[in-house]
């Protein structure tokens, strides 16, 4: 990339997110960790300590002194190293943009140093703050579209159905968590801001693809450590609900496949047989431990004993059927009564009940009749 092909600074935020245009975030690492975008990489102008020193100088001595300190801190060999990293990223991402917090001094300075090295690279007008505000507005506007929720007991396949439908929005997928005490995945949950940004981009892309209504899983406000954005959650509290009523045996088989068989495979693929089994064992024990108070001490201890026997049998034989000895009472005495109570409060909003296939057919028809 050379200075002869110069692009203007960018403020078409919609295009940036729709096309996953790469972004170089020159904020300090602590700022990036607090919230950023999936299409961004952090190559900071200043590290956290340097940023703190410049910020203190700004408060005590003003802008000019702070700028001078920044230049003295990032100078000589350090400036060369960081410029080399930016140049390498610019070459890898010739269609990208630079941004800092507000599109001000930091991104302007990086832009200037790149230009001195022979590379013209545009920055985002308004910086991170403008991009973030665009996504917050997207969330608010998206929440105004019609919604329908998929309800049903644990194991009903609600998330599966959401992902089958073109206008389905997988909130749990965006949160990297499946909602229950056993809901964590091998992908760590990100912070609240990253979750909101990821969800906003997902909604933006679906609207761009023609979605005019959302199908969502009937969720609580909290998914793992992430909270649903209030505009979305508040609209969900008014949305009609289609309930999957699958037989207990069907739900049990789904849970055994998803939380037992599949998770063992995923842990062992990620960590190898020995460590993977250990982490799989810890994952199941942690899931039970997290709800021990709601289960009561006696039931928790009994289910833990069943779990440990099931793990021993599974490790020895490769057969996971023994896990039903604790999954069945967990459903019957904990998850099913809890969801029944929650669903009763939404009874006036239930528009359809049926098995998985019937709810799927209903939602496809309902989309045509009520999605505009």
From Swiss-Prot:
The Rhodanese domain, residue ranges: 17-140
Protein family (similarity comment): Belongs to the SelU family.
BP GO terms, sorted: tRNA wobble uridine modification
Keywords: Selenium, Transferase
Highest taxon listed in the record's lineage: Bacteria
Full protein name: tRNA 2-selenouridine synthase
Subunit-structure text: Monomer.
Catalytic reactions of this protein: 5-methylaminomethyl-2-thiouridine(34) in tRNA + selenophosphate + (2E)-geranyl diphosphate + H2O + H(+) = 5-methylaminomethyl-2-selenouridine(34) in tRNA + (2E)-thiogeraniol + phosphate + diphosphate; 5-methylaminomethyl-2-thiouridine(34) in tRNA + (2E)-geranyl diphosphate = 5-methylaminomethyl-S-(2E)-geranyl-thiouridine(34) in tRNA + diphosphate; 5-methylaminomethyl-S-(2E)-geranyl-thiouridine(34) in tRNA + selenophosphate + H(+) = 5-methylaminomethyl-2-(Se-phospho)selenouridine(34) in tRNA + (2E)-thiogeraniol; 5-methylaminomethyl-2-(Se-phospho)selenouridine(34) in tRNA + H2O = 5-methylaminomethyl-2-selenouridine(34) in tRNA + phosphate
Catalytic residues identified in the record: 100 (s-selanylcysteine intermediate)
Enzyme Commission code(s) on record: 2.9.1.3
Source species of the chain: Serratia proteamaculans (strain 568)
Transferase listed as a keyword: yes
Purpose of the protein: Involved in the post-transcriptional modification of the uridine at the wobble position (U34) of tRNA(Lys), tRNA(Glu) and tRNA(Gln). Catalyzes the conversion of 2-thiouridine (S2U-RNA) to 2-selenouridine (Se2U-RNA). Acts in a two-step process involving geranylation of 2-thiouridine (S2U) to S-geranyl-2-thiouridine (geS2U) and subsequent selenation of the latter derivative to 2-selenouridine (Se2U) in the tRNA chain.
Keyword Hydrolase: no
Example of a GO MF term: tRNA 2-selenouridine synthase activity
């Amino acid at each position: 990339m050379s200075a002869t092909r110069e692009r203007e600074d960018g403020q078409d935020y919609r295009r940036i997110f729709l096309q996953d245009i790469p972004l170089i975030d020159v904020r300090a690492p602590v700022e990036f960790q607090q919230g950023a975008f999936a299409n961004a990489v952090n190559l900071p102008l200043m590290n956290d300590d340097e940023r703190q020193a410049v910020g203190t100088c700004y408060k005590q001595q003003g802008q000019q002194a702070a700028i001078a300190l920044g230049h003295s801190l990032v100078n000589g060999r350090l400036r060369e190293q960081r410029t080399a990293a930016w140049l390498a990223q610019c070459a890898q991402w010739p269609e990208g943009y630079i941004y800092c917090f507000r599109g001000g001094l930091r991104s302007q300075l990086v832009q200037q140093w790149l230009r001195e090295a022979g590379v013209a690279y545009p920055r985002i007008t308004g910086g991170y703050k403008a991009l973030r505000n665009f996504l917050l507005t997207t969330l608010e506007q998206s929440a105004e579209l019609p919604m329908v929720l998929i309800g049903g007991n644990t194991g009903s396949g609600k998330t599966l159905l959401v992902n089958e439908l073109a206008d389905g929005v997988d909130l749990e997928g965006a949160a990297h968590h499946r909602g229950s005490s056993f809901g964590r995945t091998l992908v760590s949950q990100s912070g609240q801001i990253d979750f909101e940004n990821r969800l906003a981009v997902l909604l933006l892309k679906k609207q761009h693809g023609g979605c005019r209504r959302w199908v969502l899983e009937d969720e609580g406000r909290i998914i793992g450590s992430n909270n649903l954005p209030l505009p979305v959650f508040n609209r969900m509290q008014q949305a009609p609900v289609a309930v999957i009523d699958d037989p207990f045996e069907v739900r049990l088989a789904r849970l055994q496949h998803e939380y037992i068989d599949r998770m063992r495979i995923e842990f062992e693929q990620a960590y190898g047989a020995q460590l993977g089994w250990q982490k799989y064992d810890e994952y199941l024990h942690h899931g039970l431990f997290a709800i021990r108070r709601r289960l009561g001490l006696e039931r928790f201890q009994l289910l833990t004993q069943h779990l440990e026997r099931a793990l021993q049998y599974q490790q020895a034989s490769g057969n996971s059927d023994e896990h039903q000895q604790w999954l069945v009472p967990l459903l019957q005495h904990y998850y099913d009564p809890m969801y029944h109570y929650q669903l009763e409060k939404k009874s006036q909003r239930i528009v359809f009940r049926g098995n998985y296939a019937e709810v799927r057919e209903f939602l496809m028809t309902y989309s045509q009749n009520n999605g505009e």
